[in-house]
C-alpha cells in the first residue's frame, strides 16, 4: 500500500462533500505515517490543512495514529482546527519496553507517556482511545503489572483490551 497524494484525497473529499457527505473518517493501518512513503514532504498534518479548507466538510475523524509519527505539527492542527474532532485512536498495544521491543515497535514507554501527557496538556478536552494487548509471547508478570499501573494512571477515555493471537507474519 502507498499513500495517496494530497491532491487525490482533496479531490475525492470535495466530490463527496458536494454530494452531501459532511463527516470524513481518515483510517489506515497507521494514519500518522501517511505520506512519509512518498518522500516528498507529504504528512498527515499537511493533508489535514488542505481538507479543513473545504467548505462543506464539517467533521474529520482520525483513526489509528501510532505514536512514532504523531508529531507536534499533527498535534497543533488537531488542537486548533474546529473541523478536526478532538478524538484520537492511538493503538499503543503495550507499555513495557521489553514487550514493545519484542513487538518491533519503535516507541518506548517514555516516548508514549510523553505524547499522552502532551495531548492532555495541549488539548485537555481531547478524547483518547487505545487498544492494548496482553499475553504477547515473553510478557512477564512484571510487564503485565506495569501495563495495569499505566492504565490506571492514564485513565483512557475508551480502551479495548485483547489477548494475543498469532497472525501470519508476526
Model-predicted segments: where are they?
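Canonical Radical SAM [4Fe-4S] cluster-binding loop centered on the CxxxCxxC motif
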Residues: 1-10
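ATP/adenylate-binding site constellation spanning eukaryotic-like Ser/Thr protein kinases
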Residues: 6, 89, 161
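Conserved SAM/AdoMet-binding glycine-rich loop
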Residues: 18-144
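C-terminal, non-catalytic macromolecule-binding modules
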Residues: 142-170
Amino acid at each position: 500500500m502507498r499513500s495517496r497524494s494530497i491532491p487525490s484525497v482533496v479531490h475525492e473529499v470535495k466530490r463527496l462533500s458536494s454530494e452531501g457527505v459532511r463527516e470524513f473518517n481518515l483510517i489506515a493501518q497507521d494514519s500518522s505515517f501517511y505520506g512519509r512513503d512518498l518522500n516528498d514532504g507529504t504528512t498527515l498534518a499537511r493533508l489535514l490543512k488542505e481538507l479543513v479548507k473545504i467548505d462543506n466538510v464539517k467533521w474529520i475523524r482520525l483513526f489509528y495514529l501510532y505514536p512514532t509519527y504523531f508529531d507536534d505539527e499533527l498535534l497543533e492542527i488537531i488542537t486548533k482546527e474546529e473541523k478536526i474532532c478532538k478524538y484520537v485512536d492511538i493503538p499503543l498495544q503495550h507499555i513495557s519496553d521489553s514487550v514493545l521491543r519484542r513487538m518491533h515497535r519503535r516507541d518506548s514507554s517514555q516516548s508514549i507517556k510523553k505524547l499522552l501527557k502532551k495531548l492532555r496538556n495541549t488539548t485537555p478536552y481531547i478524547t483518547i482511545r487505545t487498544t492494548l494487548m496482553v499475553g504477547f509471547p515473553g510478557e512477564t508478570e512484571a510487564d503485565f503489572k506495569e501495563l495495569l499501573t499505566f492504565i490506571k494512571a492514564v485513565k483512557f477515555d475508551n480502551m479495548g483490551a485483547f489477548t494475543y493471537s498469532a497472525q501470519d507474519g508476526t
